[in-house]
């Protein structure tokens, strides 16, 4: 039986009364965001809105983005990526569990020096996926060109974020490329492996 979203007590500043709020709302008050599912438009819109709000409240404080995601939509992920680059706040990215595909891309997109993973995390990079259902050949050709354009753009960005050469990124992302937390650090996708919150 699913447990649903847990609720936790929260006292508004200056108030004597506590009220129960969902845990994600409570974490958001502490500038902690969580990407714990497949990346889609709804998740992206929610994270973008939260980052913009937190940045407008106080851009001198970091935003913490915890990632445990198998990846998902490239366009939705790029909306999150662009927002990470856009906000003035530092964005600390923390991998807990799995950061695969777009999840790994977003992990690497955090503020340099602030990209971390817990010791048993797994990170996976690969090329973008695309489908060709029963469609006209010209439509398939258009989609293939767009996928190849996205692949090059993502690989160039991964090269910039990791310090690896474009050719190495292109070779490594040709198929699923799994890394441990330490391997991801050596590769340049993250900056540190941590085991305590104070290390982030």
From Swiss-Prot:
First-level EC class: hydrolase
Membrane-traversing stretches: none
The reaction(s) this protein catalyses: Hydrolysis of proteins to small peptides in the presence of ATP and magnesium. alpha-casein is the usual test substrate. In the absence of ATP, only oligopeptides shorter than five residues are hydrolyzed (such as succinyl-Leu-Tyr-|-NHMec, and Leu-Tyr-Leu-|-Tyr-Trp, in which cleavage of the -Tyr-|-Leu- and -Tyr-|-Trp bonds also occurs)
One GO process term, biological-process aspect: protein quality control for misfolded or incompletely synthesized proteins
Broad class of the protein's primary localization: cytoplasm
Entry keywords, A to Z: Cytoplasm, Hydrolase, Protease, Serine protease
GO (cellular component) term, any one: endopeptidase Clp complex
Compartments (UniProt record): Cytoplasm
Active site: 101, 126
A GO term for molecular function: serine-type endopeptidase activity
SUPFAM superfamilies, per the entry: ClpP/crotonase (SSF52096)
EC number annotated for this UniProt entry: 3.4.21.92
Function: Cleaves peptides in various proteins in a process that requires ATP hydrolysis. Has a chymotrypsin-like activity. Plays a major role in the degradation of misfolded proteins.
NCBIfam families (alphabetical): PRK00277.1, PRK12553.1
Family named by the database record: Belongs to the peptidase S14 family.
Summary of subunit composition and partner proteins: Fourteen ClpP subunits assemble into 2 heptameric rings which stack back to back to give a disk-like structure with a central cavity, resembling the structure of eukaryotic proteasomes.
Name by which UniProt lists this protein: ATP-dependent Clp protease proteolytic subunit 3
Organism: Parasynechococcus marenigrum (strain WH8102)
Source organism phylogeny: Bacteria, Bacillati, Cyanobacteriota, Cyanophyceae, Synechococcales
